[in-house]
Amino acid sequence: MEGSFNSKERRGHPRVFIDLPIEYQDMGDPCLRGAIVVNASDGGFLIEALKDISVGTELSITVLYPKGFILVDFKVVAKIVWKKPYSKEDLNGKQYWRGYQYGLEFMQISDEDRWKLTFVIGGRLESEKNPPSQSYQP
């Protein structure tokens, strides 16, 4: 396992369990790939992905989420701070998915996209009262 994960000692922001698709791109690779955000906070994500990516790699990420009957998104740049191999099994113990879990720390996020992140992870009521600008129309 590269890096380490100790939730009590290293986590600076509370986590919210979510299940959202993302598109990501390694900053040095033109190929778009998909993954799933498992949990999120104001400071980063836990994602599950098939591709083996090195700790320290920066990713350009687009998070897709539903708002009413439409799919909207927000973008972040994040760095992989830890990774571990990960697999899932069905109720009979048969493995049906194998990939990696990655701990990501946000490096860049715009004010508008941070507002969208806050909306997604639970600050919906407060965020709707105080949007960053009147021009925001998802």
What positions do the PLM features span?
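N-terminal helix initiation/capping motif
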Residues: M1-A40, E48, T118-P138
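Short, surface-exposed secondary-structure edge patches
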Residues: E48-S54
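Short conserved beta-strand and strand-loop elements enriched in small hydrophobics
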Residues: P21-D26, T57-F74
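Short coil-to-beta-strand transition motifs
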Residues: R15-F17, C31-L32, F69-K79
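Short coil/turn motifs at beta-sheet boundaries
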Residues: H13-R15, A40, S54-G56, L71-D73, ...
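Short, conserved beta-turn/loop elements at beta-strand boundaries and strand-helix junctions
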Residues: M27, D42, W82-E89, D111
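C-terminal output/interaction extensions
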Residues: K88-P138
